[in-house]
């Protein structure tokens, strides 16, 4: 049974996992995550240098823990995988160097995984994973994209955010409302007691040069600015800030926009399945609204398991196992890391010489 050790250190989560493919089913044998959220909360966001140092401290222990839990020695693995792009360069380097060293020491193939490919693979860890073709709404702190996954697992981006990602907007609005970092869970908790219809907020559009709008693209900067002005106006009027209503109204309009454009894109593409992955896919209002609207339109909705929505190593292992069993080439041990790399150039990560 093909088995991989996977590592993830692209931002503020150190993670290691052991995965196995058993009769065509992905099995997570062991998975560990060391979150840095509390460390970064005092600054209201991720500090790259601090993140890198914490990865260096945490990752060796996580690797040891998953090996012990899996009862697996390195000699029994078929490959090692690590996230190499996109992300914070210093943070990526910790996982990449660790993975490449382990692969070299034990004469194992190394798979440098694109972080977004990992998120796309996270839905395969569900009890009943969808079968392609389908449309993926990848919505996280750094990315908001609509990606068509074809029958041969080919990936084509059909829509994207032109400014802030949805998760980034949650963080910034959370800070505006005086909430703890990260903003997503804090806004969800506060919004539960609020009136989502109290405030009218804009659904950002992206204009085309020749007129009209990009139908599947997103823009959250205008929404963020509208929230800022609304909070300022309420404060200047001497009113107590209705934080729960503000949070609920913001959360609702984000969910509305994501659902409307995802389902429009799926219908236009003739796709009957929509998949949600990424940290924001854990949002309760978004999940409920997508399921409700999808059912009304005859579209099946799948979401990655909650524990695999945020950054984790299991999704990286899932992507690596897909490549391993498909007979794809492994990455060069000379492969470095890149803060940015387009998803449509993922195959370059397996070329020799490597692209970076």
UniProtKB/Swiss-Prot annotation:
Family matches, as SUPFAM superfamilies: Actin-like ATPase domain (SSF53067)
Catalytic activity field: L-threonylcarbamoyladenylate + adenosine(37) in tRNA = N(6)-L-threonylcarbamoyladenosine(37) in tRNA + AMP + H(+)
Coiled-coil stretches noted in the UniProt entry, renumbered to this chain: none
Cofactor note: Binds 1 Fe(2+) ion per subunit.
Predominant location: cytoplasm
Gene3D superfamilies associated with the record: 3.30.420.40
GO biological process, one term: tRNA threonylcarbamoyladenosine modification
Residues bound to substrate: 138-142, 171, 184, 283
GO molecular function per UniProt: iron ion binding; N(6)-L-threonylcarbamoyladenine synthase activity
Entry keywords, A to Z: Acyltransferase, Cytoplasm, Iron, Metal-binding, Transferase, tRNA processing
EC number assigned by the record: 2.3.1.234
Binding site for Fe cation: 115, 119, 311
Subcellular location: Cytoplasm
Required cofactor(s): Fe(2+)
Entry's Gene Ontology cellular component terms: cytoplasm
Role noted for this protein: Required for the formation of a threonylcarbamoyl group on adenosine at position 37 (t(6)A37) in tRNAs that read codons beginning with adenine. Is involved in the transfer of the threonylcarbamoyl moiety of threonylcarbamoyl-AMP (TC-AMP) to the N6 group of A37, together with TsaE and TsaB. TsaD likely plays a direct catalytic role in this reaction.
Family under the similarity heading: Belongs to the KAE1 / TsaD family.
NCBIfam families cross-referenced by the UniProt entry: gcp_kae1, T6A_TsaD_YgjD
Protein known as: tRNA N6-adenosine threonylcarbamoyltransferase
Organism of derivation: Prochlorococcus marinus (strain MIT 9303)
Lineage: Bacteria, Bacillati, Cyanobacteriota, Cyanophyceae, Synechococcales
Gene name of this polypeptide: tsaD
């Amino acid at each position: 049974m093909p088995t991989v050790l996977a590592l993830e250190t692209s931002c503020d989560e150190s993670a290691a996992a052991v995965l196995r493919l058993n009769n065509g089913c992905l099995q997570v044998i062991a998975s560990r995550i060391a979150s840095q959220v509390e460390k970064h909360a005092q600054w209201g966001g991720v500090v790259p240098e601090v993140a890198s140092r914490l990865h260096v401290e945490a990752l060796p222990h996580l690797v040891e823990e998953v090996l012990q839990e899996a009862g697996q020695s390195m000699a029994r693995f078929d490959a090692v995988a690590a996230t190499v792009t996109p992300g914070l360069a210093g943070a990526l380097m910790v996982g990449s160097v660790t993975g490449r060293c382990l692969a070299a020491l034990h004469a194992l193939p190394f798979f440098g995984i694109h972080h977004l490919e990992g998120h796309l693979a996270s839905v395969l860890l569900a009890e009943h994973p969808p079968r392609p073709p389908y449309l993926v709404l990848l919505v996280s702190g750094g990315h908001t994209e609509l990606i068509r996954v074809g029958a041969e697992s080919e990936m084509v981006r059909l829509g994207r955010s032109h400014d802030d990602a949805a998760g980034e907007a949650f963080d910034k609005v959370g800070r505006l409302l005086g909430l703890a970092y990260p903003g997503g869970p804090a806004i969800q908790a506060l919004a539960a007691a609020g009136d989502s219809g109290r405030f009218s907020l804009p659904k950002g559009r992206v204009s085309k040069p020749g007129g009209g709008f990009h139908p599947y693209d997103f823009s959250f900067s205008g929404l963020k600015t509208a929230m800022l002005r609304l909070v300022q106006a309420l404060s200047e009027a001497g009113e107590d800030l209705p934080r729960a209503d503000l949070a609920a109204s913001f959360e609702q309009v984000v969910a509305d926009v994501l659902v409307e454009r995802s389902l429009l894109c799926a219908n236009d593409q003739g796709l009957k399945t929509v998949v949600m992955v990424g940290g924001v896919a854990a949002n309760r209002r978004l999940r409920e609204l997508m399921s409700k609207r999808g059912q009304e339109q005859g579209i099946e909705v799948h979401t990655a398991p909650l524990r695999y929505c945020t950054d984790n190593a299991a999704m990286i292992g899932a992507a690596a196992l897909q490549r391993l069993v498909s007979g794809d080439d492994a990455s060069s041990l000379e492969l470095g890391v890149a803060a940015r790399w387009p998803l449509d150039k993922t195959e370059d990560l397996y070329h020799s010489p490597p692209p970076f």
